[in-house]
Amino acid sequence: MSAQSLPAATPPTQKPPRIIRPRPPSRSRAAQSPGPPHNGSSPQELPRNSNDAPTPMCTPIFWEPPAASLKPPALLPPSASRASLDSQTSPDSPSSTPTPSPVSRRSASPEPAPRSPVPPPKPSGSPCTPLLPMAGVLAQNGSASAPGTVRRLAGRFEGGAEGRAQDADAPEPGLQARADVNGEREAPLTGSGSQENGAPDAGLACPPCCPCVCHTTRPGLELRWVPVGGYEEVPRVPRRASPLRTSRSRPHPPSIGHPAVVLTSYRSTAERKLLPLLKPPKPTRVRQDATIFGDPPQPDLDLLSEDGIQTGDSPDEAPQNTPPATVEGREEEGLEVLKEQNWELPLQDEPLYQTYRAAVLSEELWGVGEDGSPSPANAGDAPTFPRPPGPRNTLWQELPAVQASGLLDTLSPQERRMQESLFEVVTSEASYLRSLRLLTDTFVLSQALRDTLTPRDHHTLFSNVQRVQGVSERFLATLLSRVRSSPHISDLCDVVHAHAVGPFSVYVDYVRNQQYQEETYSRLMDTNVRFSAELRRLQSLPKCERLPLPSFLLLPFQRITRLRMLLQNILRQTEEGSSRQENAQKALGAVSKIIERCSAEVGRMKQTEELIRLTQRLRFHKVKALPLVSWSRRLEFQGELTELGCRRGGVLFASRPRFTPLCLLLFSDLLLITQPKSGQRLQVLDYAHRSLVQAQQVPDPSGPPTFRLSLLSNHQGRPTHRLLQASSLSDMQRWLGAFPTPGPLPCSPDTIYEDCDCSQELCSESSAPAKTEGRSLESRAAPKHLHKTPEGWLKGLPGAFPAQLVCEVTGEHERRRHLRQNQRLLEAVGSSSGTPNAPPP
């Protein structure tokens, strides 16, 4: 039968790209060795080219490989070792005689190409199974070798675990000179090629100096033979199928019984034991409804076995080493999945904290039971919470794990309410964390919004909200770890207490900046047009639910106050003397301290900001400047009063009254007397410590409310008196109540801040008049000396007395008390004798 009567070869579905190899510069063409025609076919002469050179070309060959040489590797047992696979003879070699030296090769790394399905071979003589051009060749010993079993794949590269190499063109060596499709002539491959187990050269082996990239030098590698459609003997771990997703793998061709053998890659000659073992991937957890209460998950049907053969499309052909969490260990891990997975999934759908807070306020308006918690509709049913329509938090009784465990039928109504209260701590924290993440991702990390602000304004506006988010994430993770242990929550107050005494201090730092946040936000909205426009765009996003930015900035303080209310509700439901009650009391006390510190810091920052603004208005003229801004100082009261004075006239004119407007600033430890000036400036006239200021009402029923303000020691250490008029009686009462009135000395010590010019002495022992120049000193008396002589005598109000009889008073409290005693003594003496400033006898 001639070649003209044979049908044309059917091209493959995906023709692999061909690699055009350059022709060697100097190499003689091998003479055409006429071999026996294969299957009765003969070469066919093609039309001559323009240069009238003969261009012989091979015709399609139909050949059936021997049955003994096509034993599929997939038929080997799974436990077959690599040594047993390597000991087998290559399919295309007639003997197993080892080759002394392999052909040297160079490394090359071509790009891998997709594999195309290979059709199964047909019986001999069938005109429907054309193979690639192939002919019988002679072995090195001169004997004709058996028909080859290596398919010629031009440009076919396979990628694998060890970098599968290439399969180069193998032209027919029986022809002397042939041209490929691109006109390039190929040299016949007559050299020897190395096989894995030292088998004789294959029929289509390359010459020793073959320039093709597949036979270049690759140190440490040797040529391997693998089945078509398979992979090398690399341990493969099947991937676990998830019932929640569909397989996205490529469809594989059906498995064939007798696959052809094709050269696909190189394999390293290193020992197998030096390669790191591949660990199987951790199985992905499956939803509870798909693994516990539903059908078992089905494994992927496109997994490959260890020998690279498709496992099949039936679930019965799943690999035997499937992880037990998917097939065999479903009952053992059922409880673990029930504990962990079901408690995390509902928290992903929690509403924003603003929505949760509005729902809580609505619940209080909808009505509650007598014990402070919503009452169930029926006595035997689980307690149901009346909720308004819309997003709401998950209830403990709605969890699938709780419903499946039967706790709703065994727990008492009081314990069920306790579980709901404990679980609300978790769900509310999840809502709070979701809002914080939305604030951070949408506003804080927005580059468009950052470009409209200065770095200082950006830091002032958002402060340390990212640190607050980190604390909330760790707190929620600790709560979830406690909740996952059992559907029945034992206690959470100890977790709250542990975080309240430690990480929750970050709330104090954040709330301290609240005053600056409000001022910065108002200023930016009024003056920064770009900021307001970008902020409106971000607030209009669907994920923000049209909530304004200030509602996010107030979240930390709202959360810490809501947490205290939740702890109070838990404490009311705990049993007397139980561990829950003790933990709830500790947690409530720690959270209350955090709130008190937050409130104090808010007020302190407001006062500090007010002191800063007030300092910018003060002008100290002819008065020693005083540092006004202090963390311990706060402004308690300020008001405008009128000072009554006398303006002295000349000889012809008598004195006439003078009215001077004053502005008094009363701080927690200081009194400033100022006079208003233009431009809202205040000129400081005098100041004194608050403990050295006294106010007394002047009886004058016909005139406006008037009182006398006395400074026992002003900024110069001298006493001063002023007569002031108030605009109303209530204003005068406020000023009178702000200062201590003359009377018995208080038992509690006062805080002393200022010093007096003259020193004070305390008598340590009684003395006779002879020692004190006519005046006697009693023990514990407080004489006031004005001059100290070199002889050691002190001269003062009581007279001259020796210095060894007294000791100096250094305590500020005692000094202030003595000044007040002296002032009362002067007033008492002046009222009785008619001379207010008369010295004591």
From Swiss-Prot:
One of its GO terms (cellular component) is glutamatergic synapse. It comes from Homo sapiens (Human). The gene is ARHGEF15. The modification Phosphotyrosine is found at Y353. Residues 1-179, 239-261, 279-333, 765-793 are annotated as: Disordered. The modification Phosphoserine is found at S107, S109. The keyword Phosphoprotein applies. This is Rho guanine nucleotide exchange factor 15. InterPro entries: DBL_dom_sf, DH_dom, Ephexin-like, PH-like_dom_sf, PH_ephexin. It is found in: Cell projection, Dendrite.
